[in-house]
């Protein structure tokens, strides 16, 4: 009887109440990664949505980008982190670690064994049992502060180690006030010379003894500054189970502002703060309600949505007068207004920012305001910011992020400054960080492409992305009512993808300064003319004009054959450009999807291109394959780098049944819905209801607001008015639906004649 009832209940749909969405989040998803193979390269970010400060249990050595790995056996401390990626690494770091017995500062010696069986990680609360010390450590964050609690055994030798890290730090112990203050300067680049992360710590117990530490040596006195300083605060614990609490906050502006930020904690205790954090997370995640039978699918979905609302990070603070202010990571001054950071637009322009525009537009309006401030403070929009300009990746995709926001209806920020910024960035390169602006713009503007043989790497990738970015600027300018004289160059350059298409191979190919194509040419060679991919991946990076690409290839049939080949080719590769097999290659190889590389961004949209070529059922098949096979709510849950929300946002959109192939069009290309029911609660009070009936992945029939719908795309403007979308799914493809010319989504060639 029990068994029958159990399986009957399991077969019923699990309805997620919007108040409880956070309970499905698995922060450890993607954390079982290393240098050679990424299953996410994530860490459990204990934080608020878009929070200024994140917290992480630190298992890696100081300075190691892999600061938490699932396979690790020991924890070195509870660390404040601002790391967006292990490849970018961290800044503004310090940690607290409880120890018992001999006061030990060295991170190797103080590290304690732990088990995932005695670890609890949620977005708003973390706890772990530190076995070597019989101590339970707890943490609950706000946006800029945190409350920690350390439950000790009965002992006269309980300690909390405060590590300000190396590369320049300062600490001051104030025993009479139960306080410790300091700053850290450790960073990984992208900061002015005066960069500091000021931190303040306030305990609820009297100090029994204190030690200051400088460069590995215990010092007399309560104040130290040097390469690597810290403090050890000692307590007497009268009974087992007694808790020592620490209120912690930080500021990039000054110590006084850090004390201002600690007021976020108020007088709340751990339970109250956790409830506040839980409520906040449910407000954000609950914007999307999901109903389905498979609880692991729900866990995966909400874990991906959690990752989609962490970055970009808020880099602003509120002063004592209630004003929004920020330390500028570009010029080192304190300015009024918003600032956000820790995102790479090469990754996130694709669908992370479109997700914000659909579900959280008020957040992106602040981000856009911050982008205008970035331009004012540095002369360029960022392409990879952490916290300032970083030399990473290619493209000028800030143009996409800015244009898509405005074209999606976002307002209330300095649009004219952003127009000036995108035009400037299209015709200049940052004097010190050549990944900001356009490296090779002189060649591109003159020839229509970046040549392969002028010592500018990844030239085809740059050309393709610049062409799309020019289209974005053109669309943005049209919406602003700019003159044809201003717009004409961008419209013309939007076709520059044609300049690097090789008719002989049917693929994009490096082109020399003299106009000839590179030779020899191996379309399976990663890097070289491309960025973290090969010609089979990058040929499809004509987001704004798939019909134009189709014509270059010779029509729909050839286009479909070439797209089929991506999945049919074995996962062979040439890694000679790098001299070793980079992790992105290995991730493609082991996933058994041919040469499709979902673990990296360049081809993540490619699955949806069948909707342009009259074979949408193939998109439906491959989308479902990726979602079923390449995402799980486990420590190895991704198939490559999660990348600041991009790979997660792909899952979120794809679960809805549509995806923004070309940000800036206002269209979503249809795939197949993943859940039986979804409700999207928009900020304007409207609601999008998505229903799916039937088994299988193929869309047999679709209705929009009660009317039969044949097209392979949805318009954002229609959805934002509120919509009812229903799908009837089948185990067999419907090869008649969505096959007409009029069913295809937007392509620039069709609108620029």
Ranges and model annotations:
Residues 14-353, 357-400, 406-464, 472, ...:
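Accessory carbohydrate-recognition regions in carbohydrate-active enzymes
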């Amino acid at each position: 009887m029990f068994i029958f009832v159990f399986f009957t209940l399991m077969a019923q749909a699990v309805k997620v109440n919007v108040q409880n969405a956070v309970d499905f989040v698995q922060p450890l998803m993607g954390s079982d990664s290393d240098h050679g193979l990424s299953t996410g390269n994530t860490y459990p970010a204990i934080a608020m949505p878009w929070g200024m400060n994140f917290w992480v249990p630190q298992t890696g050595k100081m300075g190691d980008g892999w600061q938490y790995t699932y396979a690790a056996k020991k924890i070195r401390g509870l660390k404040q982190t601002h790391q967006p990626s292990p490849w970018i690494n961290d800044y503004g770091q310090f940690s607290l670690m409880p120890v018992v017995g001999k006061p030990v500062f060295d991170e190797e010696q103080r590290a304690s064994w732990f088990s995932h069986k005695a670890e609890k990680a949620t977005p708003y609360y973390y706890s772990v049992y530190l076995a070597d010390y019989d101590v339970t450590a707890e943490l609950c964050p706000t946006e800029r502060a945190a409350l920690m609690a350390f439950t000790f055994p009965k002992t006269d030798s309980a300690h909390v180690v405060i590590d300000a890290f190396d590369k320049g730090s300062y600490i001051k112990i104030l025993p009479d006030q139960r306080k410790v203050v300091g700053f850290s300067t450790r960073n990984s680049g992208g900061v002015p010379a005066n960069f500091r992360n000021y931190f303040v710590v306030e305990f609820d117990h009297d100090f029994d003894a204190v030690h200051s530490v400088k460069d590995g040596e215990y010092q007399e006195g309560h104040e130290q500054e040097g390469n690597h300083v810290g403090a050890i605060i000692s307590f007497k614990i009268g009974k087992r189970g007694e808790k020592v609490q620490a209120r912690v906050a930080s500021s990039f502006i000054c110590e006084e502002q850090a004390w201002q930020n600690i007021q976020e904690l108020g007088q709340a205790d751990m339970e109250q703060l956790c409830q506040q954090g839980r409520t906040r997370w449910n407000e954000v995640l609950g914007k999307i309600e999901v109903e389905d039978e498979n609880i692991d699918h729900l866990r995966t979905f909400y874990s991906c949505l959690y990752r989609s609302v962490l970055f970009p990070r808020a880099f602003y603070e509120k002063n004592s007068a209630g004003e929004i202010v920020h330390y500028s990571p570009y010029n080192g001054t304190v300015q009024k207004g918003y600032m956000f950071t820790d995102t790479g637009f090469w990754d996130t322009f694709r669908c992370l920012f479109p997700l914000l525009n659909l579900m959280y537009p008020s957040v992106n309006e602040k981000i856009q305001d911050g982008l205008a401030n970035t331009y004012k403070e540095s002369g360029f929009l960022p392409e990879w910011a952490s916290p300032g300009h970083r030399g990473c990746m290619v493209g000028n995709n800030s143009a996409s992020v800015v244009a898509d926001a405005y074209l999606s209806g976002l307002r209330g920020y300095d649009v004219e400054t952003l127009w000036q910024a995108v035009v400037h960035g299209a015709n200049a390169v940052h004097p010190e960080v050549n990944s900001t602006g356009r490296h090779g713009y002189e060649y591109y503007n003159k020839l229509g492409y970046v040549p392969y043989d002028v010592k500018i790497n990844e030239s085809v990738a740059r050309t393709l992305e610049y062409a799309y970015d020019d289209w974005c600027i053109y669309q943005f300018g049209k919406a602003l009512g700019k003159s044809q004289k201003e717009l004409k160059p961008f419209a013309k350059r939007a076709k520059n993808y044609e300049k690097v298409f090789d008719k002989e191979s049917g693929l994009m190919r490096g082109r020399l300064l003299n106009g000839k194509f590179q030779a020899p040419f191996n379309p399976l060679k990663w890097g070289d003319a491309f960025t973290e991919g090969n010609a089979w991946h990058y040929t499809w990076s004509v987001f704004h004009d798939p019909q134009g690409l189709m014509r270059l290839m010779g029509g729909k049939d050839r286009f479909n054959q070439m797209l089929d080949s991506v999945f049919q080719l074995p996962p062979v590769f040439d890694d000679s450009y790098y001299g070793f097999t980079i992790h992105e290659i290995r991730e493609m190889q082991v996933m058994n999807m041919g040469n499709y590389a979902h673990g990296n961004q360049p081809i993540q949209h490619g699955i949806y291109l069948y909707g342009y070529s009259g074979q949408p059922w193939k998109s439906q098949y491959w989308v479902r394959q990726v979602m079923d096979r390449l995402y799980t709510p486990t420590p190895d849950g991704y198939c490559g780098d999660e990348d600041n929300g991009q790979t997660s946002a792909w899952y979120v959109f794809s679960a809805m049944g549509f995806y923004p192939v070309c940000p800036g069009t206002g269209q979503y290309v249809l795939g197949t819905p993943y859940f039986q029911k979804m409700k999207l609660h928009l900020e304007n009070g409207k609601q999008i209801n998505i229903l799916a009936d039937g088994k299988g992945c193929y869309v047999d029939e679709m209705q929009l607001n009660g009317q039969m719908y044949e097209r392979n795309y949805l318009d954002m403007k229609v959805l934002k008015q509120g919509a009812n979308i229903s799908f009837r799914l089948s185990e067999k493809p419907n090869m008649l639906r969505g096959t007409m010319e009029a069913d295809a989504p937007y392509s620039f060639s069709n609108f620029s004649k």
